[in-house]
Amino acid sequence: HFMLPENPRPIPSRFSLDPQIKRECIWAGPHYRPASLLVDRDGPMIRARSERKWDVLAQHIPNFDSLFDQVGSLRSSPEVFQMREFIRRWRFYDHFRSDADAAVRQPQLGTRTPVLHHDGRDLAAALQTIIEIGDADAMRAAITDAFPGARLHIESQAGGRFAIEFFQEGLLRPLSAAELSDGTLRYLLLVAALLTPRPPSLMVLNEPETSLHPDLLPALAR
C-alpha cells in the first residue's frame, strides 16, 4: 500500500513528494484474510507469524524501504526470503539496443550466462550457454525456421571474449554481430531470452515485434 505523505507540516526534504510505503503483507492462499496473514509490515514495524503468536522482526523501517530490503533470512523469515527470491527471478526486457554502438555488436567477455542481460550485451555468451547446457536443438530450429540454411557459431577470441558468427546461404563468409541487421540481431536476442536454461515464472518482452520483419514473426511465435 503506497501513498503520498499525509503530514500537514512541511517536510524538510527535497523528497517530500516521494510515495511512502504504508503496508506490505504476505499471506497464504489466493485471497487476503487476516487468518491467512504470514508477514505484516504496518508503518515502521514488521512482524511475522510464529505458530500462534507474532514475532517482531523490525521496528524502525524507513517509509521508503520495502520489507524485502530489511528482512528475509531463511531462518527468521522464510516467507519473505522465498517471496523475494521468487520475484528476483522475474525478467523484464524493455529494450534491446541494436544501434551501431550497442555493446551486443562487440565481442564480450565470455562467462556462463544462463540468463540474458536486460540489454542483451552478453548475447554471445548466452547463446553458447544454451548450446552447452540448454536446448540447443530448439535454438538451431528457431534460427533455421527464420533464416533457412543459416547457422550460428560462437567464436572464442583472445582474452576470453566471445563473438557471434552468423552463416547465411549465399554468403562466402560469416557475418559478425556488427554486420547483422537490426531485425536479425533482435531475433537472436529474443531467441536467447526465450530459450534460457533457467526459465522464470514471469517474463515480460516489451513490443518484441519492433524492428522485426513480418516474415520473422511466425518463427518467433513458434
Located regions from the model:
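Switch/communication elements of ASCE P-loop NTPase nucleotide-binding domains
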Residues: 149-152, 156-222
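Electropositive, glycine-dotted interaction segments
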Residues: 1-137, 141
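ABC-family P-loop ATPase nucleotide-binding domains
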Residues: 133-157
